[in-house]
Amino acid sequence: MAPHSSSADAGPPVWHGTTILTVRKGGKVVIGGDGQVSIGQTVIKANAKKVRKLGKGDVIGGFAGATADAFTLFERLEAKLEQYPGQLTRAAVELAKDWRTDRYLRRLEAMMIVADKDVSLVLTGTGDVLEPEAGVMAIGSGGNYALAAARALIDTDQDAETIVRKSLGIAADICVYTNGNLTLETLTA
């Protein structure tokens, strides 16, 4: 008899979901994300909001990963933004330091894209604070698809919002953990 695996063998269920994309073009920065949350092969929620304004509305962000973990990180980032007003990069680096060294924060499973009028950044639990080379960056299960689509469109005459919408649509067509229920936030750069 051939071996098989069951959900009992696999450990806790794996949560999947989301694609977050940022595009900076033409004096605007847009972060967009889809609304799907899945556990295993089941869609649990189709209209989750994973993109939001932070601080005083001068920073926007999106997350991929565990929702509670992401909101904890957003709260910590907002505290750092209060400590370092108008300095998103400094606030992000300080959060990344805490994320790597704090015993509680180290267990959080999420990634974030944040942006203000000057800079877009990806923050990871490994302490990375990365700025995109061409104003385009993506995270999450469909991130590579959205990133490829956005890179293909960045040099066209389409604006940042259109590129985000089209790229997330392409990701949703390819990635089973991404849907077409989009949330976008925009800042004038």
UniProtKB/Swiss-Prot annotation:
Chief localization: cytoplasm
Domain of life from the UniProt record: Bacteria
Keywords on record: Allosteric enzyme, Cytoplasm, Hydrolase, Metal-binding, Protease, Sodium, Threonine protease
Gene3D superfamilies: Glutamine Phosphoribosylpyrophosphate, subunit 1, domain 1 (3.60.20.10)
GO molecular function list: metal ion binding; threonine-type endopeptidase activity
Physiological role: Protease subunit of a proteasome-like degradation complex believed to be a general protein degrading machinery.
Name listed for the protein in its UniProt record: ATP-dependent protease subunit HslV
Organism: Rhodopseudomonas palustris (strain ATCC BAA-98 / CGA009)
